[in-house]
Amino acid sequence: MKHSVHFGAGNIGRGFIGEILFKNGFHIDFVDVNNQIIHALNEKGKYEIEIAQKGQSRIEVTNVAGINSKEHPEQVIEAIQKTDIITTAIGPNILPFIAELLAKGIEARRVAGNTQALDVMACENMIGGSQFLYQEVKKYLSPEGLTFADNYIGFPNAAVDRIVPAQSHEDSLFVVVEPFNEWVVETKRLKNPDLRLEDVHYEEDLEPFIERKLFSVNSGHATSAYIGAHYGAKTILEALQNPNIKSRIESVLAEIRSLLIAKWNFDKKELENYHKVIIERFENPFIVDEVSRVARTPIRKLGYNERFIRPIRELKELSLSYKNLLKTVGYAFDYRDVNDEESIRLGELLAIQSVKDVVIQVTGLDDQELIEQIVEYI
């Protein structure tokens, strides 16, 4: 049986990446620091995924195990030494924390003489995630390890898309996911092109697909959350049931469409249909997606290369409209949740500094005209 190592045994790891790896005949070693999840994986060796749609079908994922990377790093290194593929779904901010362990696993492959080509795919909500991870891993590799990695270890970027809401069940491994899923991998950085996963799309140039996803799904989802929160909605579905909010989301997506068409020459009709499907996904009545989950970490989401500021910058450069995105940024700056550290921190910054200084600090912008435009909406 083929073997995989997946970093991140959370809902997305189990409910998306794990499902695809299982369907492709892999044994999956889930690596995490959550003892409860790791214990359950080892005790049961399987878990169930429910597809949130009419009929609510279930998939049983088997041949799984768990490794606690904090308590047993040597087991992770051993797993990396023999594995056929490595994936992650841990969040962009956590990638640097697994770099040293990955490097040790790569060194172990080198010492063992394992020259089977291996690809490491960071399945995260970020542009260039796998290459970012590689830059972190390189910091811990020996000169020999660097040469070995350049020859045998690929870090192809990936774009992933599936809504997996925050949830709690008596069975800690059980996870509910939406029917839609998309996983796209760039081919030019593959070291093992013969290992092709079914239900995964492979593209020579991934950037258009990553931007289509991040600027459409992530921007649209976050727009639903921040405007929804402003109007008191508790779930994304509740937000979409407000015609005013839905209209604003559609206006944001229209601006995103104009950027994607101008930049990547996407077909207008196909992109309109893609955005229509996104709205339908947000309106899935079988998914309970809390506004608080989607809106969390607003400081990160207001970053220079993130889902709002980057498309706004690029639309401005192209002299295209971005008024509705600006309005959403205003709602994001106003978002507060006592359980979200970043939203509280944002409020504290706005209380002690000028709005302009906070905008510069959070967004990283130096375009004075754009900074002033954002300030007007806060």
Curated annotation (Swiss-Prot):
One of its GO terms (biological process) is mannitol catabolic process. Pfam families: Mannitol_dh, Mannitol_dh_C. The keyword NAD applies. It is an enzyme of class 1 (oxidoreductase). NAD(+) binds at residues 4-15. It catalyses: D-mannitol 1-phosphate + NAD(+) = beta-D-fructose 6-phosphate + NADH + H(+). One of its GO terms (cellular component) is cytosol. Its EC number is 1.1.1.17. One of its GO terms (molecular function) is mannitol-1-phosphate 5-dehydrogenase activity. Keywords: NAD, Oxidoreductase. It comes from the Bacteria. Belongs to the mannitol dehydrogenase family. PANTHER family: ALTRONATE OXIDOREDUCTASE-RELATED, MANNITOL-1-PHOSPHATE 5-DEHYDROGENASE. This is Mannitol-1-phosphate 5-dehydrogenase. It comes from Streptococcus pneumoniae (strain Hungary19A-6).
